[in-house]
Amino acid sequence: MSLWPFGETLSHSGIDSILEEYYLIFRSLEGNETSSTDDKKNEPSMESESEFGTESRDRSDLNQSFIDRILLETALLDELNGAANDRLVDFICLGYFYDDRSQQVRHMDYLVDMLMAYLKDIDRTGYRTPFLLENSFHQTGEYEDQDDEDPMLYVNIISSIFCSKSAPIVEALVQNTPFLSSLFEVFQFENIEAENCPILAVFLKINETLLFEQTSSYLEFFKSQPNIVDKFLYHIEVSPLVEFLIKIMLTDQVESPTNIIDFLYHQDLIPKCLNLLENSKYSPGIQNSSGELLKALISISTNFKLDTLWIGPNRLTRQLASPQYVDQLINIILFQRGHAMGVAVSIIIELIRKNNSDYDEVDLLSTTIVDNPPSQRDPVYLGHLLYELTMHMEDFYALLIKLENDDDDDHDTASKALPSVKHHLLENQLHESFRPLGFERVKITELISEMLHCSNMGLMNSKRGEKIARTRDKCRDTLDQNSLEKAMKNLNINDNTITSNTLEDKCNNNDSNDSNDNQKQKKNIKKKFHDNELYSTFDTSDDNIDDDDDMSFEIPYVSETQNLKIRKNPTIGDLFKIKLHDLGFFPKFLQLFLRYPWNNFWHNIVFDIIQQIFNGRMDFSYNSFLVYSLFDFKKSTRFIPKPLYGSNQKLPVKDFHIISDFILQGHKDSFEFYEKEKTNLGYMGQLVLIAEEIAKYSKIYKTDLIAPDIYAFLQDEVWMSYSSDILNETRTMCSIILGGGQFCAESDENTNQDFLEKADMSKPAHPSTMDENEIVHEEDVKLHDKVAELIDELGQLTELDIHDKIKDVIVDHHSDLN
């Protein structure tokens, strides 16, 4: 048996033979029709003529058999991709044949029609294939001997030709508008979403090739398609289609814009996606897909470059963060509830995380409109989003309380404003009955946590930043309006009818000139500001913006004077924190923390909130008042305006102390559970971390300068004993690596030292070197002894020892108080 690749050689020879025969007939017909002999030098050799004969030819000889035979040649793709066979490329792109009616049919048109016919047949018959398109037709070499025609054979071949590395083929394809239009008809196929149906794979394979190889031409065609966004959203559950739409968006780079983002903006992509978040009309799968599309858009539109998949801030994300659509998201949270609520919350969270103003490339507080004219590529300002959310804090709290009341009373029907969601009793592995916390309460708290992150951003705590952002927004709208008017003037209007040069075409420049045009546009805008064409419209100077709006604090930070000063003219960040304080969110979160001891996801969210509060600046914004409310909520209510809680209205929480009612109470409850089950409650890990934050806070700040009451709480005998004894020992015990032994770093150092000592034994050592080695060795021995002593000491400390100390310090103290 020979291993020589005869098949490849014969196949290559087969393609050449087919082409020789085709071109011989082609030239013969051409010569008969024109009676010209000027192209003798291009005619085939005499050997070829003798092989195929020199008899006269007619049009029936130049039939479709040539292209059909070429398609079944196994070396076809290799010739197109690797060998760069120009004759073969010309045959496919420029060649033609005559059909039975003597009509000329171009090979490209024939392949296009054949592909679409097979795709329609696959859709009609519900054809399925377990194979990927990458499985080429080489693996079905015996196909031509079969009686039945497999549509996937030709679908694979033709789609591979269209996706080859041959530039003329791809260029000819992208210029074939009828084919591209017919290819987009697959959106109407019934089986496009069916599992293992190859139609979608063929569509994406061809379109992605055209997008990456002929970006400008392909996008022009894409923009010309009617209702293209609706077509994608109709199949939004098909994730490959959504990913393809994201790839199209990624072509609109800051340095080389394609204006596809503006096109999608005018096609109402954002409102159409948000309209899918309706529980009564759309399934959870559709809602999830809509949310994933918006979050993917946000991820590639961050205000700072994370990776190559980045286009920067744009009109779509700016629109999503605008008051109108933030209100729509809020209404979904409050009134749709359920699955739509979870998707809406995840969208808002992603907006905040990916548009942190602290990472903006251009600092609004240190620039001017003249130096940095506003554009749609400016970082997205989150002030509008945070303000709209803050204005609905009462609604969020009411929903939180309503969900709690639903748990407390299964028959509560008093509140009809919001739909009721009952949580039935469940049983855990310890055979304890419990009512689940619920998805909605977790989502509300997760939203509050992210809003707190947003409120700590620099721009959210600057009145000057708010004014600058508003000015830039107005200026940006004016620039957009001027561009719109200019585009309208350039429209060709005949007999009151707008020609094909539509506003869209005016807005979308050719890809080759986009970068230069973009730079020219920026220079023109900057020149207009300097020439006072737009400068006079807005007061863009910083003279009108008072730096004193950003207030400094007096000592003590927590005082009635400081409270009134902040509340009189709060920043957006302070306004949110004031709402948090007045509504009593923190005591409620911490109470639910203890009530649901096994919901670790909830515990992590609450810990994140508390950690943010204690790590915030105390001399900046309303943070110090939030900390004060954690230590003594009852006293902190004196800072709440009286009209908020009148004489007939009860406070949301009567009193709450984070040390006694949370840290110590949580330890006490866990102690009692440990007595019965010999294990701690599930929240103990996060509770200890919160206690660590309080201890760290007391060491970093002079708490008597913040509020004397806080200092007094931290000097409490029980807290002092707990923080210096139980907390320290818990921290030390938890720092030991699992399985015992020395610390990893120390172990590595000893291993390296032993290796060096063994390596040096074979060499005569210099006296000074020996002295140094002895000193190092002695130090290592001392360090080793100290570590061993520490490990021995820790080895005597167990969970039971800490449990006993909790009893002595906390439990017995509670008993004495009672």
From Swiss-Prot:
Q: Which family does it belong to?
A: Belongs to the SAPS family.
Q: What highest taxon heads this organism's lineage?
A: Eukaryota
What is the recorded function of this protein according to its Swiss-Prot or TrEMBL entry? Associates with the SIT4 phosphatase in a cell cycle dependent manner. May be directly or indirectly involved in SIT4-dependent functions in budding and in normal G1 cyclin expression.
What are the UniProt keywords, alphabetically?
Answer: Cell cycle
Instruction: Specify where the region named Disordered lies, as residue ranges.
Output: 33-60, 499-526
Q: Name one GO molecular function term.
A: protein phosphatase binding
Can you summarize the PTM annotation of this record? Hyperphosphorylated in the absence of SIT4.
Among InterPro entries, the record links this protein to: SAPS
May I have one GO cellular component term?
mitochondrion
Is Zinc set as a keyword in this record?
no
What ranges does the record list as Low complexity composition bias? 509-518
- Pfam families attached to this UniProt entry: SAPS
Q: What else is known?
A: Present with 279 molecules/cell in log phase SD medium.
Its GO biological process annotations read: G1/S transition of mitotic cell cycle; regulation of signal transduction
Q: What is this protein called?
A: SIT4-associating protein SAP4
Q: Which gene encodes it?
A: SAP4
Please verify whether the record's keywords include Iron-sulfur.
no
